[in-house]
Amino acid sequence: MNNGRFYKRYPPQHALDNWIGTAELIGRGGWTNFKHLFFHPDGTLYGVWGNKFYKAPPPTSASQSWIDEATLVGAAGWQVFQLLFFDPHGVLYGVTDGKLYRRSPPTHSLDDWIGSATLVGTGGWHVFKFLFFDPQGFLYGVENGKFHKRSPPCHANDNWLGSSTLVGTAGWSSFQQLFFMGDGQLYGVVNGNFYKRSPPAYSMDNWLGSAKLIGVGGWSGFKFLMAPVAHG
């Protein structure tokens, strides 16, 4: 997503691969107005616009009005979420007021998601810049420049951060984008460049120094970069 427009293509393969020049335009404008835009593992696109939550298949042409065709699955209150994301089985996780919740995604506009969701983190979750899952169901998080990994918390008092594996000691807050794709590779944008590699396995693993450069310059212009991640 760049300059309010929405594009799709398979990921770049090398540093000089002109991704945006060869990508298909599937949305002409307004897409940067979404606070959250992300995929369910089945390929359904979910988005928060204002205080409302929508879902629909992704657009297939630039002339399509996605939001007019989408199903409203949340009528109000969704602007409070700092982070919203799916695990690879399609369970929705959300962070608000420092707390972490999980539940199946809402199915209609009056579905009281947060009122019936399971609280799996009582506080402190606001410190994370990124939270996301890999295809195997491990939860990754970036806070204070550090990169953590662990199975997701299963109850409200589960000390996830304190018992997670540290897989990066510094510098991870500099990334503008950080996410997995279905191939199990970790993709990241930092200083306008786009990289990919297997995820770091230990704290001193020099991910950026050994990652493959797949995009030179301009990648910081994207508000969202995303793909569906189903269970591997």
Where are these regions (language model features)?
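Trp/Gly-enriched beta-strand/coil motifs that build multi-repeat beta-propeller-like domains
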Residues: 1-232
